[in-house]
Amino acid sequence: MKLAVIDLGSNSLRMGIYEKENGKIKELKRERHQVRLAEGLGADNMLKKEPMERTLKVFESYRQVLIEENVDNFKAIATESLRRAENASEFIKCVKLFTGIDIDVLDGENEAKYGAAAAKMSMDADSFYVIDIGGGSVEIAKVKEGVVVNYSSKPLGCVVMTEKFNPDEKGDGEIKAYMKQELEELEWINESLPVCVLGGVVKELAVSILGNYDFDGKKITADKVFDMYDKIYKTKVPERCEKFGIDPRRCDVMTAGLCPLTALLKKTGMGQVVFCARGVREGIAMELLDE
């Protein structure tokens, strides 16, 4: 059986088509488009016309792909952008009207749960932290002996934090202090455990450090993360693509996107970081294919 999972984030819209093979999920096709749905969401918490229109166009193209690939079983989910937007229901109705696709808005708990499920596929440890850095929110979970025991979802994503603090123009002192304060509230971050990292910004970090896209399960030290953060931050946004191999669509959100990770590493005092190439989509696909 083939299954598709569509994941609408604040920055990107993604779709994966999967099947189960030898007890594991196998990805058959992947689509990704940068839509920046949360662009301009701002203080009024209203989705703006242009981001909604470009996101709808991608949904329409994904519906066509599902038809061409003969995929009848699919699930579409959304995260922080639609959790936060006051006009989210209007957009959801619009997508349903034009594409027939129903969107389920995940709460922070389930987003953290599915991210942790994806992280387990990349980890060789049973106890660890997971941080999933998205465009609108950041999910942090604590896994002990394979079970999620604590989680948090905070609106600290790379797009909204770039809009809020603009660290590449105004300096990173304010955003770093803000991240430290936000993580201080999470008293359960109190052990030195490995940190598994997920999300689009994380992929760019992995490529900039390792030099290739074969990063799933690869381990690096926290010092390498701190060093690369400093290099990226000190490099002008237009030059980051050529110098570090970063996707041009993410060059402007890298500073804000990496601040939650550096804050978490400093709080835990743990020196090991493990990259995960999967995410919420794979966590959901695994659950549905097991049913």
Task: Please state what every model-predicted region is.
Residues 8-10, 123, 135:
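A generic beta-sheet turn/junction motif
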Residues 4, 13, 74-75, 129, ...:
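Conserved beta-strand core positions
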Residues 11-13, 136, 203:
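Conserved Rossmann-like nucleotide-cofactor binding loop
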Residues 3-7, 128-132, 195:
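Short glycine-aspartate micro-motif
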